[in-house]
Amino acid sequence: MSRYLVFDWGGTFMKYALMDEKANIVEKGKVVSPGKKDTEESFFAVIDTIVEKYPGIDGIAISSPGIIDSTEGIIDVVGVFPYLQKLPLTQLFEKRYGVRTSIENDGKAAALAEVWKGNLSDVKDGAVFLIGTSIGGGIVLDGKLRRGKDFFAGEYSSMCVNIAQPSSASSYVAQLGTSGLIEKVMGYMELDEKIDGEQAFAFINAGEPNALKALKKYTDDLAITIFSINVLLDVEKTVIGGGISQQPILLKYLKQSIQDIRTYHPDFLGGINLPLPEVDTCRFYNDANLIGALYHFLYEYHK
């Protein structure tokens, strides 16, 4: 049985797992991620301590934030680790550890997990929206992940929704990250003290009227973005992931917001009955990036 060491690099923690070719996790763990002020040398020192635990592995697969040239194995635009920008990472790993290595963007890795074994495995065309610090994900067309010529496909956060205020964070889809929902709850409830996502959903799930109004405004904005992507690509299914997607009430409200688009605009484009996107949650949550990174490795080296 082949064994692979798979990494999910994040800003807070660096997760890793020993996995087989069917994505079964044999063992996993995590360490605190190196900081932005660390160096390439100190970064690799952390990786060394993990790789040393697993002699005889058949490859290394990596999921990482940033705009990633997955063909050349280079992080073109760094998401977390500035000292890794433009380095030939897969070459460095292969030379250092003696095994084949692949790297993929974290949002695209999560999309690949859904294509391989998740809630997009039964469709040819789909979209994944990951709600985290901002909005990332991936686009799947004809069963294949669409990366784009600059590897920028699926970076929804950069979509501008208010050109009149280009320097404002509220002008971009990035506002629909978890912090955007929290800010809406705080605003609608007129809270002075900062709350976190868990507290926001405590108010929402308790049925607090203003918190529910905030959630509806949030899902209305998210629905418009999902609808716009669907008008462009006409996908069979859109799935949402990220921590807050595990809250059932989010999907319930999002589905209603999508229906409301047609209700509020019955004469849109002369009454054309535009198809509404089918939405669901991702199957995988915490392990999605690991599973997708492994799939990318297997596809690259065993296609």
Predicted regions and their residues:
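Glycine-rich phosphate-binding loop of actin/hexokinase-like ATP-binding domains
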Residues: 121-175
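Short hydrophobic alpha-helix segments
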Residues: 29-31, 79, 149
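Adenylate-forming
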Residues: 46, 110-116, 139, 158-161
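A cytosolic small-molecule/anion-sensing beta-strand core signal
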Residues: 20, 64, 141-142
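Active-site neighborhood for divalent-cation/phosphate handling
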Residues: 90-126
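ATP-binding/phosphotransfer module of carbohydrate and carboxylate kinases, centering on a glycine-rich
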Residues: 1-59, 70-72, 95-99, 117-122, ...
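Active-site glycine-centered loops adjacent to acidic/histidine catalytic or metal-binding residues
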Residues: 106, 132, 293
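A charged helix-plus-loop insertion that forms the helical arch/lid used to bind
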Residues: 73-86
